[in-house]
Structures are given as C-alpha cells and as structure tokens.
Regions:
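Short beta-strand micro-motifs enriched in acidic
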Residues: 44-47
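Short, surface-exposed ligand-recognition loops at beta-strand->loop->(often short) alpha-helix junctions
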Residues: 11-23
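Non-catalytic surface loops within mature trypsin-like serine protease
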Residues: 12-14, 60, 98-99
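A structure-centric signal for secondary-structure junctions around beta-strands
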Residues: 2-4, 49, 91
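An amphipathic, aromatic/His-enriched active-site/gating alpha helix that lines ligand/cofactor pockets
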Residues: 22-40, 57-94
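Short, structured motif recognition centered on aromatic/hydrophobic residues
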Residues: 4-9, 20, 32, 51-56
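Short, low-order "capping/linker" segments at domain edges
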Residues: 93-101
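Basic/polar N-terminal segments that are highly enriched at the extreme N-terminus
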Residues: 1-2, 101
Length: 101
C-alpha cells in the first residue's frame, strides 16, 4: 500500500487569514487528530496572509476516502467548526501525491 499526502490550498476571504488560522489551530486540527487523521503541516502562506495550506497524510487512497468521508459526516465536524471554516473559504484546490517517508 502506498501512503499518500493530500495538499489543500485555500484562498480565504480578504482579511480572514488570522481568524481562519485560529479556528484551524484550536478547533479543526484537534478534530482531525481525534479522528486519526495525520496532519503534517498547516498555516498561513508566507507570500499572502489570505492564502492557507493544510497537508494531511494517509496510508493509501482507499483509507483516505473512507476516513475523510467519516470525518466530514461526523457530528463533531458538522456541529463544530464546519460552518465558520466554509464561510471563510473563497476557493480551494486539492492535490494528492504519493508520500515517501
């Protein structure tokens, strides 16, 4: 089984980078970790305060899809930071690559 890394890149609403990072740091990333998702890195881009990234690692493509489906359907996510996070994102891009540890 080939491990994979998922890179998410977000274009945030103007001026919301600091707020978004606070939500990620205190709400979203802890939820990811509680769900068994390995978060490798996350934060505000060095070149733009309203650009954000999230890197997550999974044991394979099938595991990634199963884990993410369960996570995004969970009450903890739906009743937690979901609405505020989604509201702050103007655009998102996703890339999945093989992970060499």
């Amino acid at each position: 089984m080939t491990k994979v890394v998922e890179i998410l890149q977000y274009r945030l609403q103007a001026g919301s980078g600091e707020r978004f990072h606070h939500i990620m740091q205190h709400d979203s990333v802890p939820l990811h970790q509680a769900a068994g998702i390995t978060v490798l890195e996350y934060g505000v881009s060095l070149h733009d305060p309203d650009a954000y990234y999230l890197l997550r690692r999974f044991d394979g493509m099938v595991e990634m899809e199963q884990v993410l489906q369960a996570f995004y359907r969970s009450q903890a996510w739906l009743e937690g930071p979901r609405t505020e996070i989604v509201t702050l994102i103007d655009e998102s891009h996703r890339v999945v690559l093989p992970y060499q540890s």
